[in-house]
UniProtKB/Swiss-Prot annotation:
This is 2-phospho-L-lactate guanylyltransferase. It comes from Methanocaldococcus sp. (strain FS406-22). PANTHER family: 2-PHOSPHO-L-LACTATE GUANYLYLTRANSFERASE (PTHR40392:SF1). The keyword S-adenosyl-L-methionine does not apply. GO terms for molecular function: GTP binding; phospholactate guanylyltransferase activity. Pathway: Cofactor biosynthesis; coenzyme F420 biosynthesis. Homodimer.
Length: 227
């Protein structure tokens, strides 16, 4: 089994965070998220595919992962390329921005894989934040948009044994300043939270019935979020 992590080029990373974090800070945020994900994947064979040489070097040297230089633009094309290049048939696909994933989640997936052909963990926005395939060509890869529903439909259409792994922690992907608040609430002992704290980012409760919190940085930037 291989665990595949596709990673976008650094210069295109997390643009929705650009008003809150500099380009260098967004890069370091990504690297720390990868550290957290890699920690959850301890003992498994990890493959990182990217067009970015710095990401590939980081994956190879620090994470001790296998790396693939992406040839084509687009997430689905990158995954298909990786499928062609890796020999293993059984795969797990994980995005690079879910730092709250834990080793226990992976242990759950491995146990479930004995009984299911496809396991899908949805994101909060209808995407796919973990996809297990007993055989990498079982379904057509359809990331982007509401990919959770697309992958679920593919599994149903082919009469495959599928399981929806519904985990809040896996569902949290980091794309906006509001998302950073979830790291402070749920991400104790993560590289990602420690990095964000080092930048002076804080999260404060608004103590309202709606359960709102505020993400702020040094008193300058402030973002409210209804939970």
């Amino acid at each position: 089994m291989k665990v595949l992590i596709p990673v976008s080029p650094i210069n295109s990373l997390k643009t929705r965070l650009s008003e809150f974090l500099s380009s260098e800070e967004r890069k370091n945020l990504l690297l720390n998220m990868l550290r957290d994900i890699n920690k959850a994947l301890e003992g498994l064979d990890v493959v990182i595919i990217s067009r970015d040489e710095e990401i590939l070097e980081f994956g190879k040297n620090e994470l001790k992962a296998e790396t693939i230089k992406e040839k084509y633009k687009g997430l689905n094309k990158a995954i298909k390329q990786a499928f062609e290049e890796i020999e293993d048939d059984e795969v797990i696909i994980i995005p690079a921005d879910i730092p709250l994933i834990k080793k226990r989640h992976i242990e759950d997936i491995l146990k479930l894989s004995k009984d299911y052909d496809v396991i899908i963990a949805p994101s909060r926005g209808g995407g796919t934040n973990l996809l297990y395939l007993k055989s990498k060509n079982l379904i057509e890869i359809k990331y982007e948009g509401f990919s959770f529903l697309k992958h679920l439909e593919e599994a149903k259409k082919k009469n495959l044994r599928y399981y929806i792994y519904d985990s809040f922690l896996i569902s949290v992907d980091i794309n906006t300043p509001e998302d950073l608040g979830e790291i402070f609430i749920h991400g104790d002992s993560t590289y990602t939270k420690n990095y964000l704290k080092g930048l002076g980012i804080e999260v404060e409760s608004k103590h309202s019935s709606a359960g709102r919190f505020v993400v702020k940085r040094g008193g300058d930037n402030e973002v409210s979020n209804p939970m």
